[in-house]
Amino acid sequence: MGAEVTVQKAIYDALIAIPLRVYDAAPQDADGGSTAMFPYVEIGFIAFSEMDDKAVNGFEFVARIHSRSRSGSMMEAKEMQGQIYAALHHAELPMAGQRLVLLRRETSIVERAPDRSFHGVCEFRGQIEAT
């Protein structure tokens, strides 16, 4: 299993431990609108860059995690952001063939989406090394 799949699986497994619906791709209708039942968390893009040198074979990555709420206030989305933080920030996630060196939240924002729902985004930065 490649590093990209390993990281995706580890993040997904950590997030499903919290009592929320978690998707790696939320279901959509033909027009691209979400058909997922709110509230939910969605794993967005995970961008990788090599971090190799003579001593270390690894990757750095940035993972974007989305929270979606239709509760009528930002509070639910912010609470979801807190649950995501608790599940991932400085977590020791098991990864087959990799060692997680670092995982930390860098940014978190909640804003109103065009459909009047609330959309939160957390960005996490991590580093992994091959074992």
What are these regions (language model features)?
Residues 1-14, 46-60, 96-131:
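Short, charged interaction patches at domain edges and termini
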Residues 1-53, 75, 82-86, 91, ...:
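Small/polar-rich, solvent-exposed N-terminal microdomains that initiate assembly or binding
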Residues 37, 65, 87, 106-110:
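Charge-rich, low-complexity amphipathic helices
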Residues 60, 80-82:
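Residue-level signature of transmembrane alpha-helix interfaces in integral membrane proteins
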Residues 60-69:
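Active-site-adjacent structural patch at catalytic or cofactor/ligand-binding sites
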